[in-house]
Amino acid sequence: MNTLRMRRTVLAVTAAAVLPVALAACSSDDGGKEKASDSGSSSAPKGSTSKSMDPMAGPFGPACSTVPKEGKGSFDGMAQDPVATAASNNPALSTLVSAVKKAGLVDTLNNAENITVFAPTNDAFDKLPKDQLNKVMNDKEMLTKILTYHVVGQKLTPQQLENGSYPTLEKSKLTTSGSGTSYKVNDVSNVVCGNVPTANATVYIVDNVLMPTK
């Protein structure tokens, strides 16, 4: 009897010692799973963050820093208006806007759908000899020809500028080349602020006026 009682006592003590260890092991396993799950879920957004930081997803180029940060002339403001109206709110494009008005192209540009406009800056127009600029600005037919040469009838992404040739509204073609954030039009005009969205167009601001070949 004493022997039997002793065996029962030993078994009880052993069970009391083993049970907490087993419970602790289970608890540790669950915690490890939770930590693994937490680390997995926390790493998920990293891919989307890097994607949203793609520099080609928005406007690019050295002259973009001169665009107003707020108001209708800002990138957000321009995106709400059709292209001629959007350009009129950008101080760096005032000469272009004046030319568009003289040529009677405001409604044409504002009512067009899914176009690309290569928009010369004020400095680009200033590069033209003064007598030539005055002549062009006072010749509606010539002015219309030049301005419509800056418009392509489809929205172009930066990638499509890498090695492109596109018919313009003027009918003749212009060429584009480059990569990354550096592009040229007709090998003579640099894109200084590109991929600017408006309500109906994508705008690439350029540093030279483009001239039709014919």
Explain the meaning of each model-derived region:
Residues 2-214:
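Mature, structured domains of secreted/extracytosolic soluble proteins
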